[in-house]
Amino acid sequence: MLYLHDIWVNWFEGEENGYNVCHFHEWRKDDQIELLDQVPLLKVSPALFHYIENSLSDLPKPLLDDVYQKAYIRKNHERIQLDYCFIVTDGVGILAVDTIGYHIPIRKSRLIPRQEQLVYEMAAEAEEQKYPLPKYEKEYHILSPAPELMCGLTRKERQLKQLLFMALDQLYSTKNSAEVRYWYTEWAPEKYSDIQKMSFEEAWERLYEETKYGWSERHEQLCENLIKGQPFFEKLWETQQEPKVN
């Protein structure tokens, strides 16, 4: 078993999609950074790495058995044992995982660049561990967008885009034709006369299709307007705004 020591992690909890587990250059000052005193390193197949990175499904039992209570975190000068915590790589991607005692990868983190380099060097000499790949079918939908819809976006843009999709999903649940036509007209005023003739389904589908790729000021404006008066969405919006300097 290979081990790494003094590894900095920035846990993202409950993320089923790897694009939401931010790389070091997207870490923020108010993120809670922790120090792993000791953590085992596993080299696995690309298929298993992708499964761990992009799902919240059960991890292979032999993998869990191999890493059981072999990691320690340092908190307030205490060395605390963790049940199932490890770093996994396929030689290309790298991910730290902590199940917080469960059998699924609840917490995930990237590493800082110099520690990633150390993993690459160790993995180059290591043999791939053979673990069974659980059967699963990854399904993407409006509340769990496909990676190509998030490609090239910053952390803030990804999170605002997911907020926009949540608002569009809620809009769909209203089945209110007049409301969805209004918002589609806000997005594409030049199509006003055509939009007025559309059914609820057609107007919503076209609005979604036209907003799902990329990110722009228009997207941000639509998102901000859609969530007005909805406290839960407004709170999520505020967490992504830069602090104002007076």
Swiss-Prot record:
Stated family: Belongs to the UPF0736 family.
HAMAP family on file: UPF0736
The protein's name: UPF0736 protein GTNG_0688
Species of provenance: Geobacillus thermodenitrificans (strain NG80-2)
